[in-house]
Amino acid sequence: TGEKPFTCKECSKSFSSNSHLSRHQKIHSGVKSFTCTECDKKFLTRSSLLLHQKVHTGEKPFICTECGKGFSAKSQLHRHHVIHTGDRPFTCAECGKTFSYKQSLVTHRAAHTREKPFICTECGKSFSHKNNLQTHLKSH
């Protein structure tokens, strides 16, 4: 019926079941209890680990019907499709620049606001771009 009676106390996001809420709450705890046996990289959820493991197997079962490029996850294929449609629905209110992805707009906005929304859970250092945080995380 669309009811979502289970609410996260950290961010107020609601869920239809307690198990979905529990899975979500791992995001806030930062505890990465799932480890890849190939490279020792750690993940918050089992599903994230399983998706990552396709990097090692090279498995790419989701194929773009436009260009034939393969992806390891359905979500990656959907994200890829904008390359072919040219759709850029996200517009910067500050300068009018348009983006295909919401996250690209969020990252771009940091240039105007000097925001640093990407925060290291290990030491608290913040970054304006996700890739800078990812590079930093390798130093821990």
UniProtKB/Swiss-Prot annotation:
Pfam family, one: zf-C2H2
Keywords on record: DNA-binding, Metal-binding, Nucleus, Repeat, Transcription, Transcription regulation, Zinc, Zinc-finger
InterPro entries: Ikaros_C2H2-ZF, Znf_C2H2_sf, Znf_C2H2_type
GO cellular component term of the entry, any: nucleus
Domain of life, source organism: Eukaryota
Key word DNA-binding present: yes
Matches recorded under Gene3D superfamilies: Classic Zinc Finger
Residues annotated as transmembrane: none
Zinc finger motifs (C2H2-type), residue ranges: 6-28, 34-56, 62-84, 90-112, 118-140
Subcellular location: Nucleus
GO molecular function, one term: RNA polymerase II cis-regulatory region sequence-specific DNA binding
GO terms classed as biological process: regulation of transcription by RNA polymerase II
PANTHER family on file: ZINC FINGER PROTEIN, ZINC FINGER PROTEIN 613
Function as written in the Swiss-Prot or TrEMBL entry: May be involved in transcriptional regulation.
Protein name in the entry: Oocyte zinc finger protein XlCOF15
Higher taxonomy: Eukaryota, Metazoa, Chordata, Craniata, Vertebrata
